[in-house]
A protein has these predicted regions:
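Short glycine/proline- and aromatic-enriched beta-strand/turn motifs that initiate or cap beta-hairpins
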Residues: 18-58
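Detector for outer-membrane/organellar transmembrane beta-barrel domains
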Residues: 109-111, 115, 119-165
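Hydrophobic, lipid-facing positions within transmembrane beta-strands of outer-membrane proteins
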Residues: 35-41, 72-76, 92, 106-110, ...
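Repeated loop/turn-to-beta-strand initiation elements of outer-membrane beta-barrel proteins
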Residues: 21, 48-54, 84-88, 119-124, ...
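Solvent-exposed loop/turn segments connecting transmembrane beta-strands
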Residues: 28-37, 62-70, 97-104, 133-141, ...
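Outer-membrane beta-barrel "beta-signal"
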Residues: 180-182, 188, 202-213
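Residue-level signature of outer-membrane beta-barrel architecture
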Residues: 43-45, 80, 94, 114-116, ...
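Transmembrane beta-barrel strands of outer-membrane/channel proteins
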Residues: 25-29, 54-58, 76, 90-94, ...
Length: 213
């Protein structure tokens, strides 16, 4: 019998001056004793020509009494506007996967981003960067391409897709998709899907509740 598992957001405190931020917690549609939990936060602030962006995700999944997924992702990015559409990037990322040979990966890269489209309802940006990645095994060169898409489907409904691919000794693909409904009080209800390939493919869909600030 299917069960719907929802983790409820208890509290969040974010200093004044933040913009376009949200925190969400959620669970997955599960069968029998399978269960999944998901947590994420996004922070975005613009100051003059600078844009500061933080993103974090955590996903945990069990099948029966066996843990099959335990992953974390953290990204800190500084963008500096060069033109109306182009910008320079400085990027620090960390991701953890308990079941990967190199369970910890940290990368530091620089690059260039371009705003492909900006309208009242749709935003598309593409970024490419080069740098160094360190894992449990060694240092290696890495080239990263990311494509970000956001579309306001209706007044209260937003669709977001973030695609990222690393070209290194081993290819890493990550795609996060969200569909959110926002209430007047800042409460968010939504559904999200997280797909990763590194090299094992993992895919989980969760139903989330959260708050925007």
């Amino acid at each position: 019998m299917k069960k719907l598992v929802l983790a409820v957001l208890l509290s969040a405190i974010i200093p004044n001056g933040y913009a376009d931020n949200k925190v969400t917690l959620g669970g997955a549609m599960v069968r029998n004793t399978n269960a999944a939990a998901f947590a994420s936060f996004d922070y975005l602030k613009e100051t003059g020509l600078w844009q500061h962006a933080l993103e974090g995700n955590y996903v945990y999944q069990e099948k029966g009494d066996t843990r099959v997924r335990n992953e974390g992702f953290f990204s800190f990015k500084e963008n500096y506007a060069l033109t109306d559409k182009g910008y320079a990037i400085g990027w620090l990322r960390y991701d953890y996967d308990e079941f990967r040979n190199d369970s910890n990966r940290t990368s530091l890269s620089v690059g260039y981003g371009y705003k492909l489209l900006r309208t009242d309802t749709t935003k598309i940006s593409n970024e490419i960067s080069v740098g160094q990645m360190y894992n449990n095994l060694n240092w290696q060169d890495v080239i990263t391409n990311s494509l970000w898409f956001s579309h306001k489907v209706a007044k209260r409904v937003t669709f977001v897709n973030k695609f990222l691919i690393d070209f290194a000794d081993e290819q890493y693909i990550r795609n996060k998709t969200e569909l959110n409904y926002q209430f007047d009080e800042g409460i968010i209800l939504g559904v999200s899907n997280l797909y990763t390939k590194d090299p094992v493919i993992d895919n989980v869909t969760t139903f989330n509740i959260g708050a925007s600030f």
